Amino acid sequence: MRLKLAATDRRPDLLKNSYRATLDLFEFIHAGILTTVQDLGRFGYQRYGVPVSGAMDLFSFEVANTLAGNDKNLASLEMTLAGPTLRVINPCRIAITGADMNPTLNGEKVDLWASQSLKTGDVLAFSSAEHGCRAYLAVSGGIHAPEVLGSRSTYLRGVFGGYRGRPIRKGDVLQGTLSDAKTRIRYVPPEYIPSYPTNLTIRVVLGPQEDFFTDSGVKTFLNSTYEISPASDRMGYRLDGPRIEHSKETEIVSDGVAVGAIQVPGDRMPIILMRDAQTTGGYPKIAHVVSSDVNRLAQLRPGDNIRFEQIDIRRAHELIYQIMNHLSSLKKEIGERHPVPEFPDGETLMRFQGAIR
C-alpha cells in the first residue's frame, strides 16, 4: 500500500494540522461515459471568466457526502449516463446517490442512497442509468485532488481541476484521505429519495430581457413542451421545440450570466446555461431557472421533455428555503457528520481499519 502525505487546503474547519495522509483507493477498469471529480464549485472567479463548475446535481452530491460522513464540500465522483468499473485498492467506505446506474459489488447489487464498506480487491461496477442522468460516488475522507482556485472541481473546457483537468480514463488511480468516519451504515429514508421523471415542469422567473421577445414569443416559451437535445452538456442544455419570436435584436451587449439563465440566440431555440457555462453572454435571456430546480434539471437526459412555469421572485426565494430546510431535515435523519481528525501519529494510524497491512 502506498501512503503519502499531502498538503491540506488549509481550511481550519476541516483540519488543524498541515498535512493529511492519502492512499490509493480505486483503479479504473472502465471509465464510464463521463466520470469527473467534482465538489460544490469554484466561487469568486466569474469576474475573471472562470465558471463556477461543480456537481450538476448539488442535492445528490451533498447527500452522498453526508452518508459517507464527510464535510459537504469534499470532492466526489460525478458519473454521467453510464458509470465506471473500478477495483478497490485499499479498504474504504462509500455512498452512492443520484441516478440508478445499477451498481454492483462483486456482482451483487448495491443499495443506492446508503453507505457501503469496500475491501481490498472488491470490484464496484456501474452500468447505464435507468432513471436520471447523473450519479455520485462519495468516499469517507474525500477524493484527493489538487485545489485550483479554491476548488477541486473539474472544469473540462479549461482543462484544470479534478483529476488532471480531464475525465477519468481506464487505468487511472484515484487517491483518498484517511478518515475515521464511523462504520455504522447510513441510509436515506425512502420519503427523501427523489424520483427522476422523463417529463418535468421547471419553474422560472422571467427576465432580465423578456422585452426582447414578443408577447407571442413569451407565450410560446411558457406554453410549449421542449425536448433536451443530444447536443447538451455540462455547459448548457440545448432544447428542441417551438421557436421563440424576438421583438428586437437577437444579440445584446454582453453581460453577466448565471447558472440557470435561458438564452435565446438567433435560431430562436432556447439554451439553458448549466454549471460549466461561460460567465458572460451576448444573447437575450428570456428567463432564469430557479436555483432549487437546477438540481432536478441536471437529472434530465437527451430525449426527456420539459415545460416552463412562471413564478415570481418571492416564490423563488420560498423554494430555496424549502430545499434548504429539506436538506437540513434529511441530514438530521442521517446523522451529523463526524469531523476529520488531525493527522494521526503511528498508534492512531494503526486504528484505521485496513489502512496498514
Where are these regions (language model features)?
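Conserved "landmark" site that anchors the functional core of diverse proteins
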Residues: 2-5, 14-357
